[in-house]
Amino acid sequence: MSTIDDLPPLRDVIKRHALSARKSLGQNFLLDLNLTARIARAAGPLEDATVIEIGPGPGGLTRALLAMGAQRVIAIERDARALGALEEISGRYPGRLTIVNADATQFDSRPLLGTTRAKIVANLPYNIATALLIDWLSVEPWPPWYDTMVLMFQREVAERIVARENEEAYGRLAVLSNWRAETKILFDISPAAFVPQPKITSSVVRLVPRDKPETCERRLLEQVAAAAFGQRRKMLRQSLKSLPADPARLTAAAGIEPTQRAETVPISGFAAMARELADIRNRTNRA
């Protein structure tokens, strides 16, 4: 039996450390240890793994990760009130929990990893979740310093991450996410599982980095997607006019029609337009 069962219930931990959730920090604490264990299992085998966790709060997911054998958990927590609760967990798992009191949006965890590839597993604070994901998907060089991400988002955001062309939620976030990773919504979590209860359903998403995403420059891919989806109701021949290239030339290079709209273009099409944009730029620079 894991020593996690010897630790006090999370509700008692929250009360003892006065951990009332703060809206300004995007906090909603997940107290059901069955659910935290399910999230931890979704990351795959944890034995010998190093895990980055963002916003552990009272430590429910932290406990699950350690109980399932994670060799090391690096918990990045901005709220100093939670540090005492995390130190209690550290005492039960000596040498396996590294606690960092920092803002995850400003902290680079890579120096703590050395040459080890990590897993990122987190119930992300809602107010920084998308920004963190974009940062992780934008790292260079690629493949990245992590091999799996299992993350919780608002259901609406999760749908935007995994969407494919011709789906309502398909947009810039889906293009970047699915260009660089295989994405899947694993399961939903009811608002009733959290304290305090949010007004929306949450979803756990797994992202596995692709070793070789379709060849193109990330910044140009994002530039093309931003132009196309910035006027998503318009045809590409109109929405792509903000780019330094003839829209017809870009769509021809991708084998798509200039009368199509952004939501109908697969990621391969966006990558092809990004490559053509790079070729045009390079030829212009040589001229």
Curated annotation (Swiss-Prot):
Q: Which GO terms describe its cellular component?
A: cytosol
Mention any Pfam family matching this sequence. RrnaAD
Primary role: Specifically dimethylates two adjacent adenosines (A1518 and A1519) in the loop of a conserved hairpin near the 3'-end of 16S rRNA in the 30S particle. May play a critical role in biogenesis of 30S subunits.
Name the Gene3D superfamilies for this protein: Ribosomal RNA adenine dimethylase-like, domain 2, Vaccinia Virus protein VP39
Task: Quote the catalytic activity from the record.
Answer: adenosine(1518)/adenosine(1519) in 16S rRNA + 4 S-adenosyl-L-methionine = N(6)-dimethyladenosine(1518)/N(6)-dimethyladenosine(1519) in 16S rRNA + 4 S-adenosyl-L-homocysteine + 4 H(+)
Gene name in the database record: rsmA
Where does this one sit in the cell?
Cytoplasm
Q: Which NCBIfam families match?
A: ksgA
- Please report which protein family the annotation says this sequence is part of: Belongs to the class I-like SAM-binding methyltransferase superfamily. rRNA adenine N(6)-methyltransferase family. RsmA subfamily.
The UniProt record lists the keyword Cytoplasm: yes
Task: Provide the protein name.
Answer: Ribosomal RNA small subunit methyltransferase A
Q: Which PANTHER family match?
A: DIMETHYLADENOSINE TRANSFERASE, DIMETHYLADENOSINE TRANSFERASE-RELATED
Where, in this chain's numbering, is S-adenosyl-L-methionine bound? 28, 30, 55, 77, 103, 123
Q: Which GO terms describe its molecular function?
A: 16S rRNA (adenine(1518)-N(6)/adenine(1519)-N(6))-dimethyltransferase activity; RNA binding
Give a yes or no for keyword Methyltransferase in this entry.
yes
Protein EC: 2.1.1.182
Major location category of this protein: cytoplasm
Keyword terms, alphabetized: Cytoplasm, Methyltransferase, RNA-binding, rRNA processing, S-adenosyl-L-methionine, Transferase
